Amino acid sequence: MAGQRVRTRFAPSPTGYLHVGGLRTALYNYLFAKRMNGEFVIRIEDTDQSRKVEDAEKNLISTLEWAGIIADESPMHGGNYGPYVQSQRLDIYKKYCQQLLDDKNAYYCFSTSEELEENRQLQLKQGLQPKYNRKWLPEDMGGSMPQSEIKKKLDEGVPYVVRMKVPDYVSVWFEDVIRGPIEFDSATIDDQVLMKSDGFPTYHFASVIDDHLMEFTHIIRGEEWLPSMPKHLLLYEFFGWEPPKFAHLPLLLNPDRSKLSKRQGDVAVEDYVRKGYSSEAIVNFVALLGWNEGEGSEQEVFSMDELIEKFSLERVGKAGAVFNVDKLSWLEKQYIKTRPVDVIVEGIKPVLNEALAQRSPEMSVEWITSDDYLAKVVDLMRERVNFEHEFVTFSSYFFFEPESYEEDAVAKRWRPDMPELLGEFSKLLEANDDFTAENIEAELKAFVAPKGLKPAVIIHPLRLVVSGVSFGPSLYHMLEVLGKETVLRRIARGIERISIPEA
């Protein structure tokens, strides 16, 4: 394997959504391969046909591509090592299974599910770790079952599975790239089923065969696969193959340090996409769940190119990584602040078009969906929003007439003489040919000074009639962005609609 081109893989099962842990596994495999000028592959492990979900394979790959994780080889992209779907490789597994049977490293097992459960319960009562009792281990492999009985069952067509024969009293050892040396005692290892009665291989068997034939140099996967390592290493030994290097990633934890699960929050990537998180923020966040650049670095915002340049397995920790949604939200905010205006404009158009389809705005649709207008809204609001969709939902007054006016603000700010004051100020604005924030501010201050009023007396009601709410960006800049025609119309509308609160 020395000198071989680095090849990594992400091998999900098409059983539903992409878990955030799966995204991290895919990302680390991708980053490592690209950092080493190698190849990243997607393989679909669908050997458990009972759990297969329609379109899950396509959705998994499209989610990865949305995140910027593009495979060099996959079921959709093809490649020199296909097929890349395990259910299309059954003849390959049968061939290697027969080799194990011929070499007496595997054997037929005809035990029924009832027998297996009875044996399991008996071992539990005895305080033993449940393991197969080797009832069908042949005499010539150290067992007690005559070959004649095995042949009889095969001739009768009795359903069977094929189990690996785990050697007795041996030590299975390997060097994990992240965790260092790890050793297992074969006495704790069950005779794993390799081929099921439906003719499909188990995960353990198929993954080892495929990882070897597809020439992967590094297997980067979750910590939960560590207990399977001795079975996999024994299979490599049975076939006389050199195993790849293994790196087992730390668990993802809830803030209370329990294992991340959907019982305590969202765990599917699509859940966070639906909430409005961008691919850049999600990838950045997931990259930091276990990896850090090293001592002395305070950088927390990384582009994909920067991650590829800086990533190394040596900087991945062993301890569980806490999934802190607040950190993800903070990262999203950083990307909103720095993302090019034209990119944000394109991002909010679908949200705006959906909102427009549900409402009939009084202003011209062409105007409020123009790139120039949207760019002005983005410039003014980017410091105040957390997600792209909030440019529309949080700032709807840039696109729609206020449907109501904040009651508390009306009660607090609306004086009996406010219709008269706003009407008078509206005439000054109408005569203003230079409708800029600076001029509007100067106009307002000049208007209130002779009346002995503070600017706030007009500022708050003016914001209210224009936006319907008592908060938002700089009033003067908001008025400039909305434009004179809209501002004058909304002042008149507000004067007509807002009633003087009763004492």
Swiss-Prot record:
Q: What class of enzyme is it?
A: ligase
Pinpoint motif 'HIGH' region by residue range. 12-22
Asked whether the UniProt record includes Ligase among its keywords, one would answer yes
Give a GO molecular function annotation for the protein: glutamate-tRNA ligase activity
Pfam name, any one: tRNA-synt_1c
What Gene3D superfamilies would the database entry show? 1.10.10.350, HUPs (3.40.50.620)
GO BP annotations listed: glutamyl-tRNA aminoacylation
This chain's function reads: Catalyzes the attachment of glutamate to tRNA(Glu) in a two-step reaction: glutamate is first activated by ATP to form Glu-AMP and then transferred to the acceptor end of tRNA(Glu).
Q: Which NCBIfam families match?
A: gltX_bact
Subunit-level organization = Monomer.
Question: HAMAP family recorded for this chain?
Answer: Glu_tRNA_synth_type1 (MF_00022)
Name of the featured protein: Glutamate--tRNA ligase
Originating organism: Chlorobaculum parvum (strain DSM 263 / NCIMB 8327) (Chlorobium vibrioforme subsp. thiosulfatophilum)
Q: Which gene encodes it?
A: gltX
